[in-house]
Regions:
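Non-catalytic, conformational "gating/processing" segments within enzyme and secreted inhibitor domains
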Residues: 85, 92, 143-178
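Divalent metal-coordination and catalytic microenvironments
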Residues: 16, 56, 72, 95, ...
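Non-catalytic beta-strand/loop surface segments
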Residues: 3-4, 30-64, 101-157, 181-226, ...
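Solvent-exposed, non-transmembrane alpha-helical starts
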Residues: 9, 66-69, 105, 173, ...
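Active/ligand-binding-proximal structured segments within catalytic/core domains
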Residues: 1-34, 227-239
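Bacterial peptidoglycan biogenesis and beta-lactam-recognition machinery
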Residues: 23-27, 79, 168-169, 179-185
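Non-catalytic accessory/assembly modules
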Residues: 69, 83-116, 166, 173
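M16/insulysin-pitrilysin zinc metalloprotease superfamily fold
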Residues: 25-28, 59-91, 240-243
Length: 244
């Protein structure tokens, strides 16, 4: 249960950086073996990061469930055993290139980034991009990154979901087998982003190397699953979900 909303000013991009580092090998899974083992079992995997959570998933046949649980437990318990400064530097560069491709070098990328900083006050955990700033990524030390992992990557701060053609009792036994000895982390305070309220209309005009002008409109809306959220999803779909 960690996303960019758990980060602090000056330490942005850590949640997304770990989405990359988690696939780089752990104590009992050599670099590259995570994907190779799953592919050999007919499974696929990926991950994603938002402001509120980081998600890792594996889709595969039910007879590969134990392999999936072993791989997940090993990187939760033993990632730091193999997370060298060189490995962090390598994935840091990958993330910075990803940012260039998705923001700096993409038409309209910067205005989309600026919208969050206009909707949320400076220092609010939703005011920066999930991918982090170039400055923060460059400044992140190996010790900073290790501390982030120790704080958030523990069984008491994670949810495990197993679904599909499984025997529930057998699945629970496998979960117990592979996760029971993974040590709990320290209690993680729940993230409660300070309430944001716009008191006036904010406008910003930007110049970029694009062929056509573009207008962005943004509003602060109720939190997910709160009253009004579903209705606004429908309104957004009606206003911007199609060409007509």
């Amino acid at each position: 249960h960690v996303g960019s909303g758990s980060e602090k000013p000056g330490r942005t991009g850590f949640a997304h950086l770990f989405e990359h580092l988690m696939f780089e090998g752990s104590k009992h899974v050599p670099e590259g073996a995570f994907d190779t083992l799953l592919e050999g079992a007919g499974a696929n995997n990926n991950g994603s990061t938002t402001v509120d959570r980081t998600n890792y998933y594996i889709n595969g046949p039910s007879n590969a469930l134990e392999l999936m649980l072993f791989l997940e437990s090993d990187r939760m318990a033993y990632l730091l055993d193999t997370m060298s400064p060189e490995r962090v530097d390598g994935q840091r560069d990958v993330v910075k290139n990803e940012r260039r491709q998705s923001i700096e070098n993409r038409p309209y990328g910067i205005p989309e980034l600026e919208l969050d900083s206009m909707l949320f006050p400076t220092g609010h955990p939703y005011s920066w991009s999930t991918i982090g700033s170039m400055e923060d990524l460059s400044a992140a030390s190996h010790e900073d990154v290790q501390e982030f992992f120790r704080t958030y990557y523990a069984p008491n701060n994670a949810s495990l979901v197993v679904a599909g053609d499984i025997d529930i009792a057998a699945a629970k036994a496998l979960v117990e087998k592979w996760f029971a000895e993974v040590p709990r982390g320290k209690p993680v305070p729940p993230v409660a982003p300070p309430a944001a309220m716009l008191t006036e209309v904010t406008r910003r005009t930007m110049t970029d190397q694009v062929q056509l002008p573009r207008l962005y409109l943004g509003w602060l809306t109720p939190a997910t699953y709160q009253p009004g959220d579903a209705a606004l999803d429908v309104v957004a779909s009606l206003l911007a979900g199609g060409k007509n």
